[in-house]
């Protein structure tokens, strides 16, 4: 998962390359001390470019600074599933009490068993 964690001082081009390489739809932005700063989706990048941003511009003006997060030890699997299905999230950052990134929940990890059951029925 480290391949989708980036610092806020990268360019839009670098973010696009990271998304492309990772195969994800969203990146997690954290500082050098692993404090969560936000998320940046492929949609955020499209909106930035449509507003006139260049691929050489830095992402700090375009990422979501108040993303949906779950707090370590304070959420249930059902809550995570509801967030994923209601908001079509690709991932949800999990932070500790100090706001440091402790995990990243990925859609396919949460719904792995559901997909297996569906494939068996088909």
Regions found by a protein language model. Give the residues of each.
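The conserved cystathionine-beta-synthase
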Residues: 5-24, 30-31, 49, 70-89, ...
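N-terminal intrinsically disordered, low-complexity tails enriched in polar/charged
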Residues: 1-8, 42
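Bateman (tandem CBS) regulatory domains
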Residues: 1-4, 57-67
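Phosphate-interaction motifs
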Residues: 24-25, 36, 51-59, 75
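Short beta->alpha transition motifs characteristic of CBS
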Residues: 21, 28, 36-50, 93, ...
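N-terminal glycine-rich phosphate-binding loop and ensuing alpha1 helix
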Residues: 118-122
């Amino acid at each position: 998962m480290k391949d989708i964690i980036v610092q806020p001082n990268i360019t839009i081009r670098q973010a696009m390359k990271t998304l492309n390489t990772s195969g994800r739809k969203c990146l997690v932005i954290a500082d050098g001390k692993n404090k969560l700063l936000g998320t940046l989706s492929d949609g955020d990048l499209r909106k930035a470019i449509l507003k006139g941003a260049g691929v050489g511009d830095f992402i700090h003006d375009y990422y979501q600074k108040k993303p949906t997060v779950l707090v370590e030890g304070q959420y249930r699997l059902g809550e995570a599933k509801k967030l994923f299905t209601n908001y079509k999230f690709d991932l949800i950052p999990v932070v500790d009490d100090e706001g440091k990134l402790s995990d990243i929940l990925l859609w396919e990890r949460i719904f792995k068993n559901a997909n297996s059951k569906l494939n068996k029925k088909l």
